[in-house]
Amino acid sequence: MQMAETEQWMKDFYEKRGWTEYGPFIRIGFLMEEAGELARAVRAYEIGRDRPDEKDATQAERRQELIEEMGDVLGNLAILADKYGITLEDAMKAHQEKLIKRFETK
């Protein structure tokens, strides 16, 4: 799927469940929750968890968790962006332009 198609699918999915009704302050909380889960997945992938109460995951399972948590972050970010009429493509283009302008050699 292309990014625009993915964003539309996420928006439709979230709308069907009433999840788009949450305001931006609640949505940013969900985004931060998912960012924390991504941080935990990165840690597990890089150095492991060392938790006797958890099953030790394979590197492939850890990689899959990274992918899923990145998707959760992007999903929440896309829904938040949509509240302001912004697409992820818009945000990435603005980010690219900002970096080029900031770091271009003169």
For the regions a protein language model found, what residue spans apply to each?
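Flexible "arm" and connector segments at domain edges
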Residues: 1-70, 74-106
